[in-house]
Amino acid sequence: MDIEAKQILSAGLASLNITASQEYCDTLIAYAELIEAGNHYHSFVAASGRDLVVKHILDSLAPVNIFTNLIAANRYNTIGDFGTGAGLPGIPLALTFPDIHFTLIDRMTKRIQFLESVIAKLSINNVTVLETQAEHCKMQFDIVTFRAFHPFEYKLFKKLFKLCTPNGVIAAYKGKQDRVHSEIIEI
């Protein structure tokens, strides 16, 4: 990863009010490099270098203050990341919240194998992976998150709310605000 991408990561973390040690930054960069290397085989994201840092790593961390408040106010300790793909947003969040347990869930074996490799290479101790579809998952989580793998639909939320603990929440990452509003209206 080039120097510009590293500088953008540092500046982005500062703008998100994330206090970042050198080890934390280095781990995020190492993770981005693993995604870049895995892209040749898995086609995870259509970005590399600076774009990968901005569109995927920093985007995954953008709501960190919301997560901080939810975790503190509700004593949450489990997060399920559905349709995680390359581990987005789960891995950046897991690195940010080392005391919270994350389960990264995907239905594709090759993605699960990639994630297991990433977790081992980066020595991430608060993450497990699960190969399944949302409707077959038997676990429940304090926070259920997903990153734009489906449009907002009643059926989707019905499935995801079943995966929440009684006081759990869904944290949905979506793109443009106008698109989010139009999808919510349809629900």
What function would you assign to each model-found segment?
Residues 86-99:
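Conserved SAM-binding loop of SAM-dependent methyltransferases across substrates and taxa
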Residues 61, 91, 158:
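Active-site phosphate/pyrophosphate- and oxyanion-stabilizing loops and adjacent acidic/basic residues
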Residues 99-187:
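S-adenosylmethionine
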Residues 24, 50, 94, 130-133:
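Short loop/turn and capping residues at structural boundaries
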Residues 1-74, 80, 110-111, 117-125:
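Class I SAM-dependent transferase core
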